[in-house]
Design a protein with these regions (language model features):
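Exported/periplasmic ABC-transporter solute-binding proteins
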Residues: 1-31, 36-174
Length: 174
């Protein structure tokens, strides 16, 4: 048995099939990404389109996302350069494109991402949803207090009405 965080690619499946091995995929769980920013950052909405543009380096400054922003360059931080979070961002959000060098980097752990974002107003962190929970909230309806969780929209322009934060209920429905 093997466990993967994604579906196997055609090339991977062909490799298995050429060796007379026919893997079956079974979905065990659904996870989600969370985009976090510093508490001082007033930007709390982002479209997937703008996130893609940030990750590929097309957008590098907060003013390009929000003309009223007083922040400067966007510094995106991931948990680890080899993590499934980075892989998902490259494959599913950026359509196979490489992540931009310069304003996108990786630390070593999710906790380091949270700490970095909490200390740097220009930072945006990308972490797994399971790292967001407020430990003092037994209902699991609030997020960690040291950071702000962004709401994300599939529409080109993010608004409060079309954007969603990564609450557990949304993960349940995939």
């Amino acid at each position: 048995m093997a466990i993967a965080t994604r579906t196997l690619t055609k090339e991977e499946m062909n490799s298995f099939h050429s060796r007379k091995f026919f893997p079956r995929e079974i979905k065990l769980a659904t996870d989600g990404l969370a985009l976090i920013v510093n508490r001082a950052n007033p930007d709390s909405l982002l479209s997937v389109r703008d996130f893609r543009r940030i990750l590929t380096g097309e957008v590098k400054n907060w003013k390009e996302v929000n003309p009223d922003s007083r922040l400067k360059g966007i510094q995106v931080v991931f948990d680890n350069k080899n993590s499934s979070t980075v892989r998902f961002a490259m494959d599913s959000i950026c359509g196979g494109k490489e992540l931009a060098e310069g304003n996108v980097s990786a630390l070593k752990t999710n906790q380091q991402v949270i700490d970095y974002v909490a200390k740097n107003p220009d930072a945006m962190g990308v972490i797994g949803v399971n790292w967001l929970g407020n430990r003092s909230d037994t209902t699991n309806l609030s997020f960690r207090e040291e950071i702000r969780v962004m709401a994300v929209s599939a529409e080109d322009v993010a608004t409060p009405a079309n954007s969603y934060k990564p609450y557990q209920a949304y993960l349940f429905y995939g």
